[in-house]
Every structure is written in structure tokens, then in C-alpha cells.
A protein has these predicted regions:
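Repeated loop/turn-to-beta-strand initiation elements of outer-membrane beta-barrel proteins
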Residues: 51-53, 97-105, 141-145, 214-218, ...
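Glycine- and aromatic-enriched membrane insertion/assembly motifs of diderm outer-membrane
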Residues: 1-25, 39, 182-251, 256
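Predominantly the C-terminal beta-signal and adjacent terminal strand-loop region
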Residues: 91-159, 171-177
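Transmembrane beta-strands of outer-membrane beta-barrel pores
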Residues: 10-16, 61-67, 111-117, 137-139, ...
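Outer-membrane beta-barrel translocator domains and adjoining extracellular loop/strand segments
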Residues: 16-24, 67-76, 117-124, 147-149, ...
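Transmembrane beta-strands of outer-membrane beta-barrel proteins
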Residues: 2-8, 55-59, 105-107, 131-133, ...
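Residues that define the transmembrane beta-barrel architecture of outer-membrane proteins
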Residues: 1, 33-39, 53, 83-89, ...
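Residues on the lipid-exposed face of transmembrane beta-strands in outer-membrane beta-barrel proteins
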Residues: 1, 39-45, 59-63, 91-97, ...
Length: 261
């Protein structure tokens, strides 16, 4: 059975960043990535159980606060984090061993991502992969398992369905940022500017799905995006405005919740 939970994670980092070799006017110091505190909700599901052992996966989504971010004068090369608050995502695999009736030791590996959080920085973010170790206390383990053995679900009928999604957003361009960050000198009014032209983006997604099991549905769809380049010039004005592609989609259901990939 899956579990839903919430939690906090403290990420400590001593990472330094320096791009003085790329600059017309070197900064003369090392920037720091800094530390972060993440608040998240987690979906965890054991896929395999044998005796006291189990193996499964976790998915986490939330927000994070950072003690350092990009600053043109004090942290110029931290282009990974552009805002105090960013989006947080994590996914991982684990193996667990229940050494006592209510206690389980879990070890695994996980991927952690903090978004950049700003339109005036490259869309990079901070990415980490590392080991995980957890001690889980489940005082209601036996009661939950007994309830699961007695539970009978209503009949499930397979069916087809279609989805349509519309979206609008904004884009700035990496070429604009790189020019003002590395190429122009301090005498240029665009030097280290944080103001860039934002181009609207219009998105359309549709998919035809088949729900073949209570927990899963799969299908194929079309993704289309239109980039409004009015007000731009130079190489940017020559970018393709349309992007169209086919997308294989999979949706996982749990009660009234679902996650689409």
C-alpha cells in the first residue's frame, strides 16, 4: 500500500562557483551556492515485499527557502538559484528491512532538484544525487495490513478518455543574459542588468488515454507551443515560433489523486 506524508529537509552545501575566466570584467571573488530548507509532500510506495524486506520508490514535491541567491555584486556566479523561494522535487529508490514489528530501516538513492525561481536567470537550478538513510516508525503497521486484507474494492471497468490543457507563460532568452553578464563592460548600460524582454508563450496539449487498470492509464498526445517574438530583434527574432511534438503519456491514480508523466 502507498503512503502520503509531509516533511522538511535541510540541504547543506559548501559549493563555490567562479566564472571570472569568461568575463570582460572579472568579479574577483567566489560565489556560494548556499544552504536550503525544503518543505514537501511525499508519495511512497513499496513495489516488492518478501519477508522482512521491501523495495519501492518515492516522489516528493514542495517549496524551498535558500539563504543565498544570485546577486550582481555579492554572489554574481550563483546562476543556479535566482530567488529566496524555489520549487522542490525529489525522486528515489529504496530498500527497507523491518527489524522490529514497528521499526523499519530504509536505505537508497535519490535525486534532488531546486528550481532557479527567476525569469532573469538561466533556467538551471540545483541538482544533486545522493544516498538516503531513514528510520521509519509505523505503530499502526499491523492494523493497516489487517484492514488491507479485509478490504474489497468495487468492480473496475476499463475505459478511454481524452484530455485538453491550455497554458500561458513567459520566456526570456539565454543569449540576452549571456551578453549582459559576460560580454559587455561596466561602461555599458546593460551591464549585469536584471531586466530582460519577456516573450509570451502559449501552450496546447491534448492526449487520448486508455485506463486499463484502477491504478494506471497510458496513451499518446500532441504538444504544441507558440512563442510570440514581437518586440525582439537580431538572432532572437529569427527563432522558430512554433514547436510541435508527439508525447507518450502515463498516468498513475491513487484515490482522487493522479500523477501524469
Amino acid at each position: 500500500y502507498p503512503t502520503l506524508s509531509w516533511g522538511m529537509a535541510l540541504h547543506l552545501s559548501q559549493t563555490t562557483l567562479n566564472r571570472d575566466h569568461d568575463r570582460t570584467d572579472p568579479a574577483g571573488y567566489d560565489s556560494r551556492l548556499g544552504n536550503s530548507l525544503s518543505f514537501y509532500g511525499k508519495f511512497s510506495r513499496p513495489v516488492v515485499r518478501w519477508g522482512r524486506w521491501s523495495a519501492g520508490y518515492t516522489l516528493s514535491f514542495g517549496v524551498a527557502w535558500h539563504d543565498k541567491k544570485y546577486h550582481p555584486h555579492t554572489n554574481i556566479d550563483d546562476v543556479l538559484i535566482g530567488s529566496r523561494w524555489t520549487m522542490y522535487y525529489s525522486s528515489g529508490l529504496y530498500m527497507g528491512f523491518r527489524f522490529l514489528k514497528e521499526w523499519t530501516l530504509k536505505a537508497g538513492v535519490a535525486y534532488f532538484h531546486h528550481s532557479n525561481g527567476a525569469l532573469n536567470r538561466p533556467n538551471k537550478g540545483s541538482n544533486n544525487i545522493g544516498p538516503t538513510l531513514a528510520l521509519a516508525w509505523t505503530p499502526a503497521e499491523e492494523a493497516i495490513e489487517e484492514r488491507g486484507r479485509k478490504f474489497t474494492s468495487p468492480p473496475f471497468h476499463r475505459y478511454f478518455y481524452a484530455t485538453v490543457l491550455l497554458g500561458i507563460g513567459g520566456k526570456t532568452f539565454d543569449s540576452d543574459w549571456r551578453r549582459t553578464q559576460y560580454t559587455v563592460g561596466k561602461d555599458n548600460p546593460d551591464y549585469l542588468t536584471t531586466r530582460f524582454h519577456v516573450s509570451p508563450v502559449y501552450e496546447f496539449q491534448t492526449a487520448f488515454m486508455y485506463r486499463y487498470a484502477r491504478r494506471w492509464a497510458s496513451g499518446i498526445g500532441i504538444d504544441a507551443e507558440y512563442l510570440d517574438l514581437s518586440g525582439t530583434s537580431g538572432d532572437i527574432a529569427r527563432y522558430d515560433r512554433w514547436s510541435v511534438g508527439l508525447a507518450a503519456q502515463h498516468e498513475v491514480f491513487y484515490g482522487h489523486l493522479s500523477l501524469r508523466m
